[in-house]
Amino acid sequence: MSQGVPAPLARHAMAYVLAGGRGSRLMELTDRRAKPAVYFGGKSRIIDFALSNALNSGIRRIAVATQYKAHSLIRHLQRGWNFFRPERNESFDILPASQRVSDDMWYRGTADAVYQNIDIIESYDPKFIVLLAGDHVYKMDYEKMLQQHVEQGADVTVGCLEVARSEASAFGVMDVDAKDVIRSFLEKPADPPAMPGKPDKSLVSMGIYVFDTKFLIEELHRDAANPDSSHDFGKDIIPYIVKHGKAVAHHFDKSCRRSHAEDTSYWRDVGTVDAYWAANIDLTDIVPQLDLYDREWPIWTYGEITPPAKFVHDKDGRRGEAVSSLVSGGCIISGASLRHTLLFTGVRAHSYTHIEGAVILPYADIGRSCRLTNVVVDAEVRIPDGLVVGEDPELDAKRFRRSENGTCLITQPMIDRLGT
Protein backbone atom coordinates (compact mmCIF):
# COMPACT_ATOMS: atom_id res chain seq x y z
CA MET A 1 0.00 0.00 0.00
CA SER A 2 1.46 3.36 -1.01
CA GLN A 3 2.11 5.89 1.75
CA GLY A 4 -0.89 8.13 2.33
CA VAL A 5 -3.38 5.79 0.68
CA PRO A 6 -5.91 4.56 3.27
CA ALA A 7 -6.54 0.85 3.63
CA PRO A 8 -9.84 -0.29 2.12
CA LEU A 9 -12.71 -0.15 4.59
CA ALA A 10 -13.91 -3.49 3.21
CA ARG A 11 -11.07 -5.15 5.12
CA HIS A 12 -12.90 -4.27 8.32
CA ALA A 13 -16.39 -5.21 7.11
CA MET A 14 -18.53 -8.30 7.28
CA ALA A 15 -21.17 -8.98 4.63
CA TYR A 16 -24.36 -10.44 6.05
CA VAL A 17 -26.66 -11.81 3.34
CA LEU A 18 -30.35 -12.36 3.99
CA ALA A 19 -31.31 -15.38 1.89
CA GLY A 20 -34.32 -16.91 3.61
CA GLY A 21 -37.14 -15.60 1.44
CA ARG A 22 -39.35 -17.75 -0.74
CA GLY A 23 -40.13 -15.30 -3.52
CA SER A 24 -43.75 -16.41 -3.88
CA ARG A 25 -44.33 -14.26 -6.99
CA LEU A 26 -42.08 -16.68 -8.88
CA MET A 27 -44.85 -19.21 -8.40
CA GLU A 28 -43.83 -22.87 -8.81
CA LEU A 29 -40.25 -21.87 -9.59
CA THR A 30 -39.70 -21.55 -5.83
CA ASP A 31 -41.68 -24.62 -4.78
CA ARG A 32 -38.41 -26.53 -4.31
CA ARG A 33 -35.95 -23.73 -3.56
CA ALA A 34 -35.63 -20.29 -1.97
CA LYS A 35 -35.56 -17.33 -4.33
CA PRO A 36 -31.80 -16.68 -3.81
CA ALA A 37 -31.16 -20.25 -5.01
CA VAL A 38 -33.06 -19.79 -8.28
CA TYR A 39 -30.85 -20.27 -11.34
CA PHE A 40 -29.82 -17.24 -13.39
CA GLY A 41 -27.71 -16.48 -16.44
CA GLY A 42 -26.82 -19.98 -17.57
CA LYS A 43 -24.54 -21.02 -14.71
CA SER A 44 -25.20 -18.95 -11.60
CA ARG A 45 -27.75 -18.67 -8.82
CA ILE A 46 -29.26 -15.29 -7.95
CA ILE A 47 -27.38 -15.14 -4.64
CA ASP A 48 -24.04 -15.32 -6.47
CA PHE A 49 -24.39 -11.65 -7.44
CA ALA A 50 -24.51 -10.31 -3.88
CA LEU A 51 -21.74 -12.71 -2.82
CA SER A 52 -19.55 -11.85 -5.81
CA ASN A 53 -20.02 -8.14 -5.17
CA ALA A 54 -18.83 -8.65 -1.61
CA LEU A 55 -15.81 -10.69 -2.69
CA ASN A 56 -14.88 -8.34 -5.53
CA SER A 57 -15.25 -5.36 -3.18
CA GLY A 58 -12.60 -6.83 -0.87
CA ILE A 59 -14.87 -8.19 1.88
CA ARG A 60 -13.50 -11.45 3.24
CA ARG A 61 -15.95 -12.21 6.02
CA ILE A 62 -19.38 -13.31 4.81
CA ALA A 63 -22.40 -14.86 6.51
CA VAL A 64 -25.58 -16.11 4.81
CA ALA A 65 -28.82 -16.49 6.78
CA THR A 66 -31.17 -19.11 5.31
CA GLN A 67 -34.66 -20.30 6.17
CA TYR A 68 -37.21 -21.32 3.51
CA LYS A 69 -36.41 -24.63 1.73
CA ALA A 70 -32.71 -24.04 2.15
CA HIS A 71 -31.24 -27.38 1.05
CA SER A 72 -30.61 -26.39 -2.58
CA LEU A 73 -29.11 -23.08 -1.49
CA ILE A 74 -26.91 -24.58 1.22
CA ARG A 75 -25.62 -27.26 -1.15
CA HIS A 76 -24.74 -24.60 -3.72
CA LEU A 77 -22.91 -22.48 -1.12
CA GLN A 78 -20.98 -25.49 0.19
CA ARG A 79 -19.85 -26.43 -3.30
CA GLY A 80 -19.20 -23.02 -4.79
CA TRP A 81 -18.14 -20.83 -1.87
CA ASN A 82 -15.85 -23.10 0.12
CA PHE A 83 -12.57 -21.35 -0.71
CA PHE A 84 -12.39 -18.95 2.26
CA ARG A 85 -9.46 -19.64 4.60
CA PRO A 86 -9.45 -18.81 8.34
CA GLU A 87 -5.65 -18.56 8.32
CA ARG A 88 -6.06 -15.54 6.01
CA ASN A 89 -8.65 -14.00 8.34
CA GLU A 90 -11.43 -15.08 5.98
CA SER A 91 -14.72 -16.72 6.90
CA PHE A 92 -17.89 -17.94 5.22
CA ASP A 93 -20.73 -18.98 7.53
CA ILE A 94 -24.10 -20.47 6.60
CA LEU A 95 -26.67 -19.65 9.27
CA PRO A 96 -29.91 -21.64 8.95
CA ALA A 97 -32.83 -20.68 11.16
CA SER A 98 -32.20 -22.92 14.16
CA GLN A 99 -34.21 -21.62 17.13
CA ARG A 100 -31.08 -20.14 18.67
CA VAL A 101 -33.01 -17.69 20.88
CA SER A 102 -36.07 -19.78 21.78
CA ASP A 103 -37.28 -23.33 21.22
CA ASP A 104 -40.36 -22.07 19.38
CA MET A 105 -38.82 -19.15 17.49
CA TRP A 106 -37.54 -19.22 13.91
CA TYR A 107 -36.47 -16.02 12.14
CA ARG A 108 -39.38 -13.64 12.69
CA GLY A 109 -38.19 -11.01 10.20
CA THR A 110 -35.09 -9.67 8.49
CA ALA A 111 -33.86 -7.90 11.62
CA ASP A 112 -34.45 -10.98 13.74
CA ALA A 113 -32.40 -13.04 11.25
CA VAL A 114 -29.44 -10.90 12.25
CA TYR A 115 -30.34 -10.56 15.94
CA GLN A 116 -30.40 -14.32 16.47
CA ASN A 117 -26.79 -14.52 15.24
CA ILE A 118 -25.30 -11.56 17.11
CA ASP A 119 -22.89 -13.85 18.95
CA ILE A 120 -21.42 -15.06 15.66
CA ILE A 121 -21.00 -11.49 14.41
CA GLU A 122 -19.33 -10.46 17.66
CA SER A 123 -16.92 -13.40 17.47
CA TYR A 124 -15.43 -11.91 14.28
CA ASP A 125 -15.50 -8.34 15.64
CA PRO A 126 -16.00 -6.49 12.32
CA LYS A 127 -16.12 -2.71 12.41
CA PHE A 128 -18.87 -2.54 9.78
CA ILE A 129 -21.77 -4.72 8.70
CA VAL A 130 -22.82 -4.64 5.05
CA LEU A 131 -26.33 -6.06 5.09
CA LEU A 132 -27.44 -7.49 1.75
CA ALA A 133 -30.51 -9.00 0.15
CA GLY A 134 -29.61 -12.25 -1.57
CA ASP A 135 -32.24 -12.07 -4.29
CA HIS A 136 -31.26 -9.24 -6.66
CA VAL A 137 -29.16 -9.17 -9.83
CA TYR A 138 -26.61 -6.34 -10.06
CA LYS A 139 -22.91 -5.47 -9.86
CA MET A 140 -21.84 -3.04 -7.14
CA ASP A 141 -18.67 -1.97 -5.34
CA TYR A 142 -19.58 -1.90 -1.64
CA GLU A 143 -16.28 -0.18 -0.80
CA LYS A 144 -17.65 3.07 -2.21
CA MET A 145 -20.76 2.76 -0.09
CA LEU A 146 -18.61 2.15 2.99
CA GLN A 147 -16.61 5.27 2.19
CA GLN A 148 -19.72 7.44 2.03
CA HIS A 149 -20.98 5.91 5.28
CA VAL A 150 -17.80 6.95 7.09
CA GLU A 151 -17.43 10.34 5.41
CA GLN A 152 -20.96 11.41 6.34
CA GLY A 153 -20.90 9.93 9.84
CA ALA A 154 -24.11 8.00 9.23
CA ASP A 155 -25.81 5.65 11.65
CA VAL A 156 -27.04 3.71 8.63
CA THR A 157 -26.39 4.13 4.92
CA VAL A 158 -29.11 2.81 2.62
CA GLY A 159 -28.47 1.82 -1.00
CA CYS A 160 -31.07 3.39 -3.28
CA LEU A 161 -32.03 3.85 -6.90
CA GLU A 162 -34.76 5.49 -8.97
CA VAL A 163 -37.63 3.37 -10.28
CA ALA A 164 -40.90 4.13 -12.01
CA ARG A 165 -43.42 5.36 -9.44
CA SER A 166 -45.87 2.74 -10.69
CA GLU A 167 -43.47 0.02 -9.49
CA ALA A 168 -42.34 1.64 -6.23
CA SER A 169 -45.00 0.14 -3.97
CA ALA A 170 -42.96 -3.09 -3.91
CA PHE A 171 -40.06 -1.31 -2.16
CA GLY A 172 -39.18 0.98 0.70
CA VAL A 173 -39.59 4.55 -0.60
CA MET A 174 -37.55 7.46 0.74
CA ASP A 175 -37.25 11.23 0.56
CA VAL A 176 -33.81 12.81 0.92
CA ASP A 177 -32.39 16.31 1.34
CA ALA A 178 -29.61 17.97 -0.68
CA LYS A 179 -26.95 16.06 1.29
CA ASP A 180 -28.76 12.72 0.84
CA VAL A 181 -29.87 12.56 4.46
CA ILE A 182 -33.09 10.55 4.53
CA ARG A 183 -36.03 12.63 5.77
CA SER A 184 -38.74 9.97 5.47
CA PHE A 185 -38.91 6.24 4.77
CA LEU A 186 -42.09 4.34 3.92
CA GLU A 187 -42.01 0.57 3.50
CA LYS A 188 -44.04 -0.59 0.48
CA PRO A 189 -46.56 2.29 0.46
CA ALA A 190 -49.77 1.89 -1.54
CA ASP A 191 -49.31 5.41 -2.95
CA PRO A 192 -45.54 5.93 -3.31
CA PRO A 193 -44.38 9.55 -3.10
CA ALA A 194 -42.67 10.92 -6.21
CA MET A 195 -39.21 12.46 -6.33
CA PRO A 196 -39.09 16.28 -6.39
CA GLY A 197 -39.14 17.39 -10.01
CA LYS A 198 -39.69 13.81 -11.21
CA PRO A 199 -43.41 13.03 -10.88
CA ASP A 200 -43.06 9.61 -12.52
CA LYS A 201 -40.11 8.44 -10.40
CA SER A 202 -39.62 7.32 -6.80
CA LEU A 203 -36.40 6.83 -4.85
CA VAL A 204 -36.45 3.31 -3.40
CA SER A 205 -34.33 1.15 -1.13
CA MET A 206 -32.25 -1.63 -2.67
CA GLY A 207 -32.34 -3.60 0.59
CA ILE A 208 -28.63 -2.84 1.09
CA TYR A 209 -27.54 -1.27 4.38
CA VAL A 210 -24.22 -0.32 5.96
CA PHE A 211 -23.98 -0.04 9.75
CA ASP A 212 -21.25 0.41 12.29
CA THR A 213 -21.43 -2.97 14.01
CA LYS A 214 -21.70 -1.55 17.53
CA PHE A 215 -24.61 0.68 16.54
CA LEU A 216 -26.40 -2.14 14.72
CA ILE A 217 -26.17 -4.48 17.69
CA GLU A 218 -27.62 -1.81 19.98
CA GLU A 219 -30.51 -1.27 17.57
CA LEU A 220 -31.19 -4.98 17.26
CA HIS A 221 -31.39 -5.38 21.04
CA ARG A 222 -33.75 -2.40 21.24
CA ASP A 223 -35.95 -3.80 18.48
CA ALA A 224 -35.99 -7.33 19.93
CA ALA A 225 -37.32 -5.95 23.22
CA ASN A 226 -40.20 -4.16 21.49
CA PRO A 227 -43.31 -6.41 21.51
CA ASP A 228 -44.99 -4.25 18.87
CA SER A 229 -42.17 -4.62 16.33
CA SER A 230 -42.32 -6.93 13.31
CA HIS A 231 -38.52 -7.19 13.58
CA ASP A 232 -37.94 -6.09 10.01
CA PHE A 233 -35.34 -3.64 8.73
CA GLY A 234 -37.61 -1.92 6.23
CA LYS A 235 -40.66 -1.74 8.48
CA ASP A 236 -39.04 -1.08 11.86
CA ILE A 237 -35.28 -0.50 12.07
CA ILE A 238 -34.76 1.98 9.22
CA PRO A 239 -37.83 4.19 9.95
CA TYR A 240 -36.74 4.39 13.61
CA ILE A 241 -33.24 5.53 12.69
CA VAL A 242 -34.64 8.07 10.21
CA LYS A 243 -36.63 9.63 13.09
CA HIS A 244 -34.07 9.32 15.87
CA GLY A 245 -30.66 9.14 14.18
CA LYS A 246 -28.89 9.85 10.92
CA ALA A 247 -29.81 7.76 7.90
CA VAL A 248 -28.06 8.54 4.62
CA ALA A 249 -28.92 7.44 1.08
CA HIS A 250 -26.25 6.00 -1.20
CA HIS A 251 -27.17 6.28 -4.87
CA PHE A 252 -26.50 3.13 -6.88
CA ASP A 253 -25.01 5.15 -9.74
CA LYS A 254 -22.06 6.03 -7.47
CA SER A 255 -20.97 2.42 -6.97
CA CYS A 256 -22.46 0.43 -9.84
CA ARG A 257 -19.77 -1.59 -11.60
CA ARG A 258 -19.89 -1.19 -15.36
CA SER A 259 -17.67 -2.74 -17.99
CA HIS A 260 -16.86 -0.98 -21.26
CA ALA A 261 -19.91 -2.74 -22.73
CA GLU A 262 -22.36 -1.39 -20.14
CA ASP A 263 -23.69 2.16 -20.41
CA THR A 264 -26.46 2.03 -17.79
CA SER A 265 -26.75 1.02 -14.14
CA TYR A 266 -28.18 -2.50 -14.08
CA TRP A 267 -30.27 -3.74 -11.15
CA ARG A 268 -33.10 -6.26 -11.34
CA ASP A 269 -35.42 -7.71 -8.72
CA VAL A 270 -36.47 -10.67 -10.97
CA GLY A 271 -39.30 -11.23 -8.51
CA THR A 272 -41.95 -12.34 -11.01
CA VAL A 273 -41.95 -14.97 -13.75
CA ASP A 274 -42.09 -12.22 -16.39
CA ALA A 275 -39.21 -10.28 -14.84
CA TYR A 276 -37.16 -13.45 -14.42
CA TRP A 277 -37.74 -14.51 -18.02
CA ALA A 278 -36.97 -11.04 -19.39
CA ALA A 279 -33.74 -10.61 -17.41
CA ASN A 280 -32.43 -13.95 -18.65
CA ILE A 281 -33.52 -13.41 -22.26
CA ASP A 282 -31.91 -9.94 -22.22
CA LEU A 283 -28.57 -11.73 -21.91
CA THR A 284 -28.99 -13.08 -25.45
CA ASP A 285 -28.85 -9.57 -26.94
CA ILE A 286 -25.80 -8.68 -29.02
CA VAL A 287 -24.78 -6.16 -26.34
CA PRO A 288 -26.77 -7.03 -23.20
CA GLN A 289 -27.33 -4.48 -20.44
CA LEU A 290 -25.65 -6.87 -17.98
CA ASP A 291 -22.14 -7.93 -18.98
CA LEU A 292 -21.39 -11.41 -17.62
CA TYR A 293 -18.12 -11.45 -19.56
CA ASP A 294 -16.53 -8.71 -17.43
CA ARG A 295 -13.28 -10.27 -16.22
CA GLU A 296 -12.60 -7.36 -13.87
CA TRP A 297 -15.79 -8.08 -11.89
CA PRO A 298 -16.48 -11.81 -12.25
CA ILE A 299 -19.63 -13.47 -10.97
CA TRP A 300 -18.30 -16.35 -8.91
CA THR A 301 -20.32 -19.56 -8.69
CA TYR A 302 -20.08 -23.33 -8.46
CA GLY A 303 -18.59 -24.61 -11.70
CA GLU A 304 -19.91 -28.09 -12.35
CA ILE A 305 -17.50 -30.28 -14.33
CA THR A 306 -19.15 -30.94 -17.69
CA PRO A 307 -18.08 -31.64 -21.27
CA PRO A 308 -18.48 -28.85 -23.85
CA ALA A 309 -21.84 -28.16 -25.45
CA LYS A 310 -22.46 -30.30 -28.52
CA PHE A 311 -24.42 -29.57 -31.73
CA VAL A 312 -25.21 -32.46 -34.09
CA HIS A 313 -27.10 -33.09 -37.38
CA ASP A 314 -26.99 -30.82 -40.42
CA LYS A 315 -30.04 -31.37 -42.58
CA ASP A 316 -32.83 -28.95 -43.44
CA GLY A 317 -35.37 -29.09 -40.63
CA ARG A 318 -33.00 -31.16 -38.52
CA ARG A 319 -30.00 -28.95 -37.93
CA GLY A 320 -28.46 -28.53 -34.51
CA GLU A 321 -28.05 -24.76 -34.27
CA ALA A 322 -28.31 -21.79 -31.95
CA VAL A 323 -28.67 -18.11 -32.89
CA SER A 324 -28.46 -15.27 -30.35
CA SER A 325 -28.47 -17.85 -27.57
CA LEU A 326 -26.42 -18.88 -24.53
CA VAL A 327 -25.70 -22.62 -24.28
CA SER A 328 -23.99 -23.97 -21.17
CA GLY A 329 -21.63 -26.91 -20.79
CA GLY A 330 -23.02 -30.41 -21.05
CA CYS A 331 -25.86 -29.44 -23.40
CA ILE A 332 -26.57 -31.52 -26.50
CA ILE A 333 -28.52 -29.86 -29.32
CA SER A 334 -29.42 -32.84 -31.48
CA GLY A 335 -31.09 -31.57 -34.63
CA ALA A 336 -32.96 -28.79 -32.78
CA SER A 337 -32.86 -25.04 -33.45
CA LEU A 338 -32.62 -22.31 -30.81
CA ARG A 339 -33.22 -18.57 -31.08
CA HIS A 340 -32.91 -16.02 -28.27
CA THR A 341 -32.74 -18.87 -25.79
CA LEU A 342 -30.71 -19.56 -22.66
CA LEU A 343 -29.84 -23.15 -21.75
CA PHE A 344 -28.41 -24.06 -18.38
CA THR A 345 -26.10 -27.01 -17.78
CA GLY A 346 -26.91 -30.40 -19.25
CA VAL A 347 -30.03 -29.56 -21.27
CA ARG A 348 -30.87 -31.83 -24.22
CA ALA A 349 -33.00 -30.74 -27.17
CA HIS A 350 -33.94 -33.40 -29.70
CA SER A 351 -34.54 -33.45 -33.46
CA TYR A 352 -37.08 -31.30 -35.30
CA THR A 353 -37.66 -29.15 -32.21
CA HIS A 354 -37.75 -25.35 -32.44
CA ILE A 355 -37.17 -23.27 -29.31
CA GLU A 356 -37.43 -19.47 -29.20
CA GLY A 357 -37.38 -17.08 -26.24
CA ALA A 358 -36.86 -19.88 -23.73
CA VAL A 359 -35.10 -20.11 -20.37
CA ILE A 360 -34.44 -23.80 -19.75
CA LEU A 361 -32.99 -24.81 -16.39
CA PRO A 362 -30.41 -27.57 -15.79
CA TYR A 363 -30.84 -31.10 -17.10
CA ALA A 364 -34.22 -30.54 -18.72
CA ASP A 365 -34.90 -32.82 -21.69
CA ILE A 366 -36.87 -31.44 -24.64
CA GLY A 367 -38.43 -34.15 -26.84
CA ARG A 368 -38.64 -34.39 -30.63
CA SER A 369 -40.84 -32.16 -32.81
CA CYS A 370 -41.62 -29.66 -30.04
CA ARG A 371 -42.27 -25.94 -30.48
CA LEU A 372 -41.58 -23.86 -27.38
CA THR A 373 -41.94 -20.06 -27.42
CA ASN A 374 -41.59 -17.66 -24.47
CA VAL A 375 -41.24 -20.31 -21.78
CA VAL A 376 -39.39 -21.01 -18.56
CA VAL A 377 -38.76 -24.75 -18.12
CA ASP A 378 -37.85 -25.85 -14.60
CA ALA A 379 -34.85 -28.06 -13.86
CA GLU A 380 -34.98 -31.75 -14.85
CA VAL A 381 -38.34 -31.43 -16.61
CA ARG A 382 -39.02 -34.00 -19.35
CA ILE A 383 -40.89 -32.34 -22.22
CA PRO A 384 -42.76 -35.00 -24.25
CA ASP A 385 -42.45 -35.31 -28.02
CA GLY A 386 -44.62 -32.96 -30.03
CA LEU A 387 -45.49 -30.50 -27.25
CA VAL A 388 -46.42 -27.02 -28.50
CA VAL A 389 -46.36 -24.08 -26.05
CA GLY A 390 -46.65 -20.38 -26.78
CA GLU A 391 -49.04 -20.46 -29.73
CA ASP A 392 -52.46 -20.94 -28.09
CA PRO A 393 -52.87 -18.69 -25.01
CA GLU A 394 -56.08 -20.32 -23.79
CA LEU A 395 -54.67 -23.83 -24.01
CA ASP A 396 -51.40 -22.73 -22.40
CA ALA A 397 -53.28 -21.19 -19.45
CA LYS A 398 -55.16 -24.45 -18.85
CA ARG A 399 -52.04 -26.61 -18.83
CA PHE A 400 -49.27 -24.39 -17.44
CA ARG A 401 -48.63 -21.26 -15.38
CA ARG A 402 -49.14 -18.46 -17.91
CA SER A 403 -48.12 -14.96 -16.79
CA GLU A 404 -49.73 -11.62 -17.55
CA ASN A 405 -47.25 -11.03 -20.36
CA GLY A 406 -47.66 -14.49 -21.84
CA THR A 407 -44.64 -16.30 -20.41
CA CYS A 408 -45.37 -19.95 -19.62
CA LEU A 409 -43.72 -21.60 -16.63
CA ILE A 410 -43.47 -25.38 -17.10
CA THR A 411 -42.72 -27.77 -14.23
CA GLN A 412 -42.68 -31.57 -14.08
CA PRO A 413 -45.96 -31.87 -12.14
CA MET A 414 -47.63 -29.83 -14.89
CA ILE A 415 -46.24 -32.18 -17.53
CA ASP A 416 -47.35 -35.20 -15.51
CA ARG A 417 -50.92 -33.86 -15.42
CA LEU A 418 -51.07 -33.73 -19.23
CA GLY A 419 -51.62 -37.47 -19.34
CA THR A 420 -54.45 -37.52 -16.81
UniProtKB/Swiss-Prot annotation:
GO molecular function: ATP binding; glucose-1-phosphate adenylyltransferase activity
Enzyme Commission number: 2.7.7.27
Catalytically driven reaction(s): alpha-D-glucose 1-phosphate + ATP + H(+) = ADP-alpha-D-glucose + diphosphate
Taxonomy, superkingdom: Bacteria
Keyword Nucleotidyltransferase: yes
Pathway assigned to this chain's UniProt record: Glycan biosynthesis; glycogen biosynthesis
Alphabetically ordered keywords of this record: ATP-binding, Carbohydrate metabolism, Glycogen biosynthesis, Glycogen metabolism, Nucleotide-binding, Nucleotidyltransferase, Transferase
Keyword Oxidoreductase (UniProt): no
Binding-site residues for alpha-D-glucose 1-phosphate, renumbered to this chain: 107, 172, 187-188, 205
One of the GO BP terms on file: glycogen biosynthetic process
Quaternary context: Homotetramer.
Alphabetical list of NCBIfam families matching this protein: glgC (TIGR02091), PRK00725.1 (NF001947), PRK00844.1 (NF002023)
Alphabetical list of HAMAP family matching this protein: GlgC
PANTHER family on file: GLUCOSE-1-PHOSPHATE ADENYLYLTRANSFERASE (PTHR43523:SF2), GLUCOSE-1-PHOSPHATE ADENYLYLTRANSFERASE-RELATED (PTHR43523)
UniProt record similarity statement: Belongs to the bacterial/plant glucose-1-phosphate adenylyltransferase family.
Name of the molecule in the record: Glucose-1-phosphate adenylyltransferase
Originating species: Rhodopseudomonas palustris (strain BisB5)
